[in-house]
Regions:
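Alpha-solenoid HEAT/Armadillo repeat architecture
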Residues: 12, 27, 44, 65, ...
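Residue-level signature of catalytic and energy-coupling elements of molecular machines
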Residues: 11, 47-49, 110, 139, ...
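Conserved catalytic-core segment of NTP-binding enzymes
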Residues: 148, 169-183, 198-303
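Short hydrophobic/aromatic residue motifs in ordered secondary structure
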Residues: 50-52, 142, 258, 286
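Short glycine-rich anion-binding loops that position phosphate/pyrophosphate groups of nucleotides
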Residues: 193-195
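N-terminal accessory targeting/assembly segments
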Residues: 1-19
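Primarily NTPase-proximal linker/entry elements flanking Walker-type ATP/GTP-binding cores
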Residues: 17-138, 145-166, 173-190
Length: 305
């Protein structure tokens, strides 16, 4: 199955819902001021964000679409091109090909976004690219989290460093990086406990993990990935804002895009923060984490290829 097919199938529910709603506005209508306002309102309701919605509305207005043409198709083409222009600079396929030296990756996010599963899937992609990968189980609050990461490590045959439940997460991360440097590893993926962005003590602990890794390598963590749940809608904006204040984020991964989530939130994030998008979670299977590609995302989102 090709990458477009995987994006298309993964996005089927959210893309179908989006285009269906848009079609209801446009069908059998000319693009007049009232229709443009309805399109803008619909885009905002679809989590695209106010700024992007206004820009798209302006482009549609300036295009002066011939009413004899397939208006829905013309609007979708405008959307597709807008998405590609906005998001192409945010592709970061190179993340999966870093092998020159150890890349310590801090993976964070609020509770329930699928961090541990995402780490397992990242690990599988990295290993398939020839990288030597280690997992570091720094979510020491939940025994289940350690067990889940260990299960992934066994499944894809990568090394894991762990400690007993209740151990200091920062020390676990430190030991992992130290061991990885000695063992010639390319990547250490550091799993952290889910934490609400408004809980100061938990966010301080998260910062401590990053600071401790710097004792081994001043540039560590080399990547800081925030995992987001697409079903959270506009809440993810606040999550990016708060996590980015503590430790600058180098990349985003959006999960749960295979359901009825409004994929438009990715446009809002791209417009506001311009952070690289590492990958998208399009299902529960091992291979359902797809490296982000702006063109394939745009094609799947608008259902145009």
């Amino acid at each position: 199955m090709g990458i477009f097919d995987k994006f298309k199938i993964g996005f089927k529910k959210s893309a179908s819902a989006f285009t269906s709603g848009l079609r209801d506005i446009i069908i059998k209508k000319e693009i007049d001021d009232k229709t443009l306002d309805q399109i803008e309102e619909y885009l905002i309701q679809s989590d695209v964000g106010l700024v992007a919605a206004k820009e798209i509305k302006k482009i549609i207005a300036e295009e002066k679409i011939d009413p004899k043409k397939d208006i829905m198709n013309e609007v979708n083409l405008i959307l597709k091109n807008y998405i590609i222009t906005l998001m192409k600079p945010l592709e970061n396929e190179g993340f999966f090909n870093k092998k020159e030296k150890l890349n310590a990756v801090l993976v964070s996010g609020v509770n329930g976004v699928g961090k541990t599963t995402t780490i397992g899937k990242i690990g599988k992609i990295l290993k398939s690219n020839g990288s030597k990968v280690m997992f570091s189980a720094c979510d020491t609050f939940r025994a289940a989290a350690i067990e889940q990461l260990e299960s992934w490590a066994n499944k894809i045959d990568v090394q894991i460093t762990k400690s007993a439940q209740g151990s200091d997460p920062a020390s676990v991360a430190y030991n992992a990086i130290e061991e990885a440097l000695k063992g010639g590893f390319n990547h250490v993926l550091i799993d952290t406990a889910g934490r609400l962005q408004n809980k100061k003590n938990l966010m301080e602990e998260y910062k401590k993990i990053a600071n401790v890794t710097k004792k081994i390598d001043p540039d560590a963590p080399h990547d800081v990935i925030l995992v987001l749940d697409a079903t959270s809608g506009q809440n993810v904006i606040n999550q990016v804002e708060e996590f980015n204040k503590i430790i600058p984020i180098t990349g985003l991964i959006m999960t749960k895009l295979d359901g009825t989530a409004k994929g438009g939130i990715l446009l809002a994030l791209a417009k506001k923060y311009k952070l690289p998008i590492i990958a998208l979670g399009l299902g529960e299977k091992e291979d359902d984490l797809q490296i982000f590609n702006a063109e394939k995302f745009a094609e799947a989102f608008t259902q145009i290829n």
